[in-house]
């Protein structure tokens, strides 16, 4: 592509990071930031150790445990660590705690106030920046695209490669624009927007593409809302998702620990401003969504694409034209224990999870607390937990009194971590029970063997807690 041809945001970031272009169409890409956690890094560090290699840029690498950490008390009264029950989880956590300092990498551990979910910590610390290439051995790394970064998940062998070389060999993706225009109505949040997008595109709609989310709705969202949008880019098949950086982005980042300062800040902002997609630039595919079509949303099946407005009815498998979709719908209905024509608002839930890298930031806490204030969870809700995305989110929420709102409503107020987003730690949903969850995946067994997951926004999760069933949050709004 000519340097004078109009380019998209993604193309500009890509071009700025090409170290070498190869004849087969692949490019050696420089990686600006590398986030590591305890699950996908042990083998990578062991391979470095065996080869006698060092981490090339430890200053551009940040290690944060999150997947396996229990969200209940982690230290005894005298400061000793509470033992991790699962041996594999304990080994992974111990390995990261040992590997990070050995290789000169900053480690934000469970004793640090800044510890949390890696995709919350990165933006919060200013480690994630617009225009940067960011990788992590985790599916939801696209989250950082809410700041205008090109961020994507990688496998363990690639984790090793980035640690050793600070580069990756990649093929450039196609470009896709998802434009959301209009104005969101009360009760409709960023989570509802991205669930709706996933329903429109389908689980594979963005395959092979990097999506740029544009339009008035995206511009009007807060940075935390944009992080929620980009977080779920992988759920509609995209390699990454981007929101163009703007004045909101700069205000969010300024003064954060890893953000540039002084003259470096001014230079950075000048470059970030240049990243906007040029007038006349074209995308390989464009999808336009009208905000008036987006309602508080909920999933009914076992894929994030199985989305309905809360007022909707469970679909019949025969309503899908594609035979494979019909078969998938039958399997989903059997697993989820639902029947065609059932009202989503009639579905009872026994568990509530507010947390995950999608929805565990301070705005998410506030949105849920606003619905719960002065109310109690329903008697049929056995288990309701709120898991802040980081120690700093937890501290701020406590300063605002939000923890008291949750506790008085019958919720447990937990320590930061991935928690019940995935069945990899003690926070699991019992088999056959339902959970209204603010996480990003509703796959079979995602929250524990036999667990039935309904993805919703924090406000919708709070509403479900109060009524004991999936509920239109607008009915509870003052």
Curated annotation (Swiss-Prot):
Query: Which InterPro entries does the UniProt record give?
Result: 3-IsopropMal_deHydase_lsu, Acnase/IPM_dHydase_lsu_aba_1/3, Acoase/IPM_deHydtase_lsu_aba, Aconitase_4Fe-4S_BS, Aconitase_4Fe-4S_dom, IPM_dehydratase_rel_enz, IPMI_cat
**Reactions this protein catalyses:** (2R,3S)-3-isopropylmalate = (2S)-2-isopropylmalate
Question: Which EC number(s) are documented for this chain?
Answer: 4.2.1.33
UniProt-recorded Gene Ontology molecular function terms? 3-isopropylmalate dehydratase activity; 4 iron, 4 sulfur cluster binding; metal ion binding
One GO BP annotation is: L-leucine biosynthetic process
How does this protein assemble?
A: Heterodimer of LeuC and LeuD.
What does the UniProt record say this protein does? Catalyzes the isomerization between 2-isopropylmalate and 3-isopropylmalate, via the formation of 2-isopropylmaleate.
Keywords assigned by UniProt, alphabetized: 4Fe-4S, Amino-acid biosynthesis, Branched-chain amino acid biosynthesis, Iron, Iron-sulfur, Leucine biosynthesis, Lyase, Metal-binding
Protein family per UniProt: Belongs to the aconitase/IPM isomerase family. LeuC type 1 subfamily.
The protein depicted here goes by the name 3-isopropylmalate dehydratase large subunit
The UniProt record gives the binding positions of [4Fe-4S] cluster as 357, 418, 421
Biological source species: Novosphingobium aromaticivorans (strain ATCC 700278 / DSM 12444 / CCUG 56034 / CIP 105152 / NBRC 16084 / F199)
